[in-house]
Design a protein with these regions (language model features):
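Residues that recognize and position ribonucleotide moieties
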Residues: 7-9, 40, 119
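Short amphipathic alpha-helical recognition elements used for nucleic-acid or partner binding
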Residues: 21-51, 69, 184-187
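Surface-exposed helix-capping loop/turn segments at secondary-structure junctions
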Residues: 75-79, 162-165
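C-terminal flanking helix
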Residues: 66-77, 210
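Short amphipathic alpha-helical interaction segments
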Residues: 57-68
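Intrinsically disordered, charged and Pro/Gly-enriched terminal/linker segments
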Residues: 21, 37, 52-59, 86-257
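Conserved RecA-like P-loop NTPase ATPase core
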Residues: 16, 47, 69, 117, ...
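Short boundary/linker motifs that mark transitions into or out of structured domains
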Residues: 1-27, 82-87, 254-257
């Protein structure tokens, strides 16, 4: 069954849209996700190690996995396999990702286009993928997370400047679903709530950050835990103090909890 385009969505629970049929093996779907972020093509030894890093797999298992992925993806509108046969596995050009779509929208200067990009985020990155360690080890996860955070910070700043604090807050909270430990996002959240003139939400955002910082600052083995404020970047506490006084301070220093 021909399908003009297939999209691999990873900005939340992993979905593969536009397939010709279901994946009968979870590893087959995982393989398609892996190939979607390794477009140069990969040999059996590489992708099987990525999907099963803790054990070797037989050629028959690898063959049945790739065959199921090929069957599920089907063909493009011209009858070409989305996953052609060959020594190296490489997805066809009609298979794209939501990260590519996000990136194309994120390059626009129009804040509303950034808003559209942020709507693509549905939850934690690569959520539900059974075999996702490769995304951590080869930097794919970090690169996507960095793209989303940069975009969110740029969009939130633009909306605050336009006096649209609600949109700025929405963008930041969307990004926090994917990158919950980036302190820069919390500084942007403080700015967004302050821009709405809502001191209750400003206090709530800071309380949320302090709770998270407190959880991370108190591992079980620590005998003298840090206070939540000790774990925060000085720029964050300075910004919060100045926002309470009604005089926003400059922020933007990279920091993670």
């Amino acid at each position: 069954m021909p399908t003009d385009a297939v999209e691999v969505a990873v900005l939340g629970p992993v979905l593969v849209h536009g397939t010709a049929g279901p994946f009968r093996r979870s590893a087959a779907r995982d393989l398609v996700v892996y190939l979607a972020f390794h477009r140069r093509g990969v040999r059996h030894a590489e992708w099987s190690l990525a999907l099963w890093p803790d054990r070797p797999v037989s050629l028959s298992t690898a063959h049945s996995t790739s065959s199921d992925a090929r069957r599920a993806l089907g063909c493009d509108g011209e009858g070409r396999l989305h996953l052609p046969r060959g020594v190296e596995l490489r997805l066809g050009d009609a298979v794209t990702t939501d990260v590519e779509h996000f990136g194309s929208l994120a390059t626009e200067d129009d804040p509303d286009q950034i808003l559209r990009a942020m709507r693509l985020i549905r939850g934690p990155l690569f959520s539900g993928l059974h075999r996702a360690d490769w995304a951590i080890f080869d930097g794919t996860h970090a690169n996507i997370e960095a793209l989303v955070v940069r975009t969110a910070l740029r969009g939130a700043d633009a909306f605050v400047r336009l006096g649209r604090g609600e949109e700025a807050e929405w963008i930041v909270r969307r990004a926090l679903q994917l990158s919950p430990y980036d302190e820069r996002l919390y500084r942007a959240l403080l700015m967004a709530t302050a821009a709405q003139g809502n001191r209750v939400r400003l206090h709530s955002a800071m309380a949320q950050l302090r709770t998270l910082a407190g959880d991370l600052a108190c591992p079980p083995a620590r005998t003298a835990p840090l206070t939540p404020s000790d774990s925060l970047h000085p720029a964050t506490t300075a910004l919060y103090r100045d926002l309470l006084l009604g005089s926003p301070a400059a922020g933007g220093h990279p920091a993670r909890l």
